[in-house]
């Protein structure tokens, strides 16, 4: 009986070790490396969208780093999008002189890219649902 139990334990260990060794060999023998694929949002992050606030695609939370923008001025910018140039943001109707001066002082922090459906669908730009 001891012989059978020892044989069973030895076979189990051998099979277990073969499983660990086999996985490494399978990974080492992969002929083609797996290349990461970029989706539309990841690809947009490699443009100015990743470094500046995109007036056509950024949500309201992206404006928190700019003094005096969050939430009122940021929501006006989002509601009046899309823009063709950064300077068009100065033409938003109903802006006060203070808001216009804040916009002018921060024009270098903005960029304009084509609106992306992945980033602008629904009301996610006003309420992105991050709590």
Swiss-Prot record:
Residues 29-36 form a propeptide. It is found in: Cellular thylakoid membrane. It is a peripheral membrane protein. Pfam families: PsbU. Residues 1-28 form the signal peptide. Belongs to the PsbU family. PSII is composed of 1 copy each of membrane proteins PsbA, PsbB, PsbC, PsbD, PsbE, PsbF, PsbH, PsbI, PsbJ, PsbK, PsbL, PsbM, PsbT, PsbX, PsbY, PsbZ, Psb30/Ycf12, peripheral proteins PsbO, CyanoQ (PsbQ), PsbU, PsbV and a large number of cofactors. It forms dimeric complexes. This is Photosystem II extrinsic protein U. It comes from Synechocystis sp. (strain ATCC 27184 / PCC 6803 / Kazusa). The gene is psbU.
């Amino acid at each position: 009986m001891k012989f059978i139990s020892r044989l069973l334990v030895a076979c189990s260990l051998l099979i277990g070790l073969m499983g660990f060794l086999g996985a490494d060999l399978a990974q080492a023998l992969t002929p083609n490396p797996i290349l990461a694929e970029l989706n539309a949002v990841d690809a947009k992050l490699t443009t100015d969208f990743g470094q500046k606030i995109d007036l056509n695609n950024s949500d309201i939370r992206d404006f928190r780093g700019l003094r005096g923008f969050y939430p009122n001025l940021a929501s006006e910018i989002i509601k009046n999008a899309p823009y063709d140039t950064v300077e068009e943001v100065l033409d938003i109707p109903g802006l006060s002189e203070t808001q216009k001066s804040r916009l002018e002082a921060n024009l270098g922090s903005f960029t304009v890219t084509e609106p992306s459906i992945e980033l602008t669908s629904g009301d996610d730009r006003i309420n992105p649902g991050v709590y």
